A protein has these predicted regions:
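Juxtamembrane/disordered regions of integral membrane proteins
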Residues: 1-142
Length: 142
């Protein structure tokens, strides 16, 4: 296992996941999710956000993507996007349905947009990691 390549891919995936998550859930879908949550007061305000945990969680997802794509021998952006989006959609759908069943936090109308948003973000993360894994040596001569 090329741990250096896996480490760089994990960092790359985590950083991209963080910024895309901020854009998608923190800006684009924030109002929709707030209006379809059963208790919006449980969400932390920007001032009370625990950023070390947010950054850590995004890095974990970046390394998870990097590890799965490494083990699947992904070497192209397209194959990385497809595999990452598929896994993300399934994990998000499963976890959202279990949360809906057990907690009074969200309405069912949140599930599909969240699954689609997660798949989109993961597709971009997976495409980037697939590109990184498939690129040739940097010192190639012509």
């Amino acid at each position: 296992m090329d741990t250096a390549k896996l480490f760089v891919a994990g960092l790359l995936g985590g950083v991209i996941n963080f910024f895309l998550g901020w854009l998608v859930w923190g800006i684009l879908l924030m109002d929709y999710f707030s209006s379809h949550t059963t208790n919006p007061q449980v969400a932390r305000s920007s001032e009370n956000m625990v950023f070390w945990a947010l950054i850590g969680g995004n890095l974990v997802f970046g390394f998870l993507h990097a590890y799965i794509l490494y083990k699947a021998n992904v070497k192209t952006p397209a194959s990385g996007a497809i595999l990452a989006a598929t896994i993300s959609a399934l994990v998000t759908l499963g976890s959202n349905l279990m949360m809906y069943a057990q907690y009074d936090l969200l309405q069912l109308s949140i599930v599909l947009p969240d699954v689609l948003a997660s798949a989109l973000v993961s597709a971009i993360v997976g495409a980037t990691i697939g590109w990184y894994y498939g690129r040739g040596p940097l010192n190639k001569t012509v």
